[in-house]
């Protein structure tokens, strides 16, 4: 069972983070909804909250309304215009050192999590992201059958060996977009 130790709610309702213990091992779970007009500030706030989580196995999941790979993740396929939101999302995932856990286990599978009746299209908009330092703990991933929603749930299985290992620290590149932070960091580097 999951023993909760803490919760953080986004004031705008975009994400909720819960942390606690599973079989005595620290875990962080973040549930995300990013609206279709993906704003850099929303990703920045989410990134800061992720970096503030206590050490533990971390899973960030939800509807990001963006595509990692338009060729594999959209029925529209290759050749359609790559949207700025897709590019921003991929850059954000990379800047935090996150991996698409489902894609790691299904590198060539074409499977969708969202159906748009209005557009007559299918997309994979729902992701389970994990730090690259935790991805070795996964034992599998799959898309589950759709229920009443227009989105299908995604499931990963996590083992427990090595789960207490602390992840490597990494500077979130989103901080460098803040002029005051970049100036302060530059002064510290020159002083060092």
Q: Which residues are covered by each model-predicted region?
A:
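Structured beta-strand-rich core segments of catalytic domains in phosphoester-bond hydrolases
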Residues: 1-26, 32
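Short secondary-structure junctions
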Residues: 1-10, 97-104, 137-145
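Beta-strand elements of modular eukaryotic interaction domains
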Residues: 5-8, 19, 48-50, 115-119, ...
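Short coil/turn segments at secondary-structure boundaries
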Residues: 8, 41-45, 72-75, 142-143, ...
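A short catalytic or substrate-binding loop motif that flags glycine-/basic-rich loops and adjacent residues
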Residues: 8-13, 38, 106-107, 119-123, ...
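Surface polyanion/phosphate-binding segment centered on an Asp-His-Pro turn
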Residues: 19-21, 57-59, 121-123, 127-128, ...
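Active-site metal-binding loops of divalent metal-dependent hydrolases
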Residues: 32-34, 64
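Metal-dependent phosphoesterases centered on the DNase I-like endonuclease/exonuclease/phosphatase
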Residues: 42-133, 186-192
């Amino acid at each position: 069972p999951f023993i909760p130790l803490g919760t953080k709610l986004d004031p705008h309702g975009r994400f909720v983070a819960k942390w606690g213990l599973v079989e005595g091992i620290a875990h962080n779970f973040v549930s995300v909804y990013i609206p279709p007009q993906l704003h850099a500030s929303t990703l920045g706030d989410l990134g800061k909250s992720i970096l503030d989580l206590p050490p533990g196995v971390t899973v960030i999941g939800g509807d990001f309304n963006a595509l990692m790979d338009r060729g594999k993740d959209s029925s529209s396929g290759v050749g359609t215009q790559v949207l700025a939101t897709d590019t921003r999302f991929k850059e954000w995932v990379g800047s935090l050192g996150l991996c698409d856990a489902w894609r790691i286990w299904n590198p060539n599978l074409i499977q969708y999590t969202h159906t748009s009746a209005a557009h007559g299209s299918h997309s994979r908009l729902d992701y389970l992201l994990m730090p690259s330092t935790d991805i070795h703990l996964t034992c599998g991933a799959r898309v589950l059958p759709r229920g009443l929603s227009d989105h299908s749930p995604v499931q990963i299985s996590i083992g427990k060996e090595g789960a207490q290992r602390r992840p490597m620290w990494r500077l979130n590149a989103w901080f460098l977009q803040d002029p005051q932070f970049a100036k302060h960091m530059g002064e510290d580097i020159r002083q060092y």
